[in-house]
């Protein structure tokens, strides 16, 4: 089995000082992306949504949305509140009991692409995010198919 390269913790768009968090417009834009992502998943990828904690049938739990929001803010180079509250993300460990194959990876990426579209994220930052999300989604696969 070929081991996938481990993604870097905080992505950088260039050698400049701006982080993806800054380029996206900060906290409110990132949290809007998270809401659009989970809304798209609930609407378009119900099998993937069902792998998450639910508040009601078909509704991904607020705690999951909030936790991913904190994680994404930090991962994009913003405040490290996730680390302060939850420790190191340890993505593979935290997702280890969730069956993630190619179908789940692709459903996750479709949900994120829909959210990025809905939030109007375009240009170089979009290309960068598409690439980085694909790398991380593939890294988290723990099933062959």
Label each residue range with its predicted role.
Residues 3-145:
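Core of compact, soluble alpha-helical bundle domains
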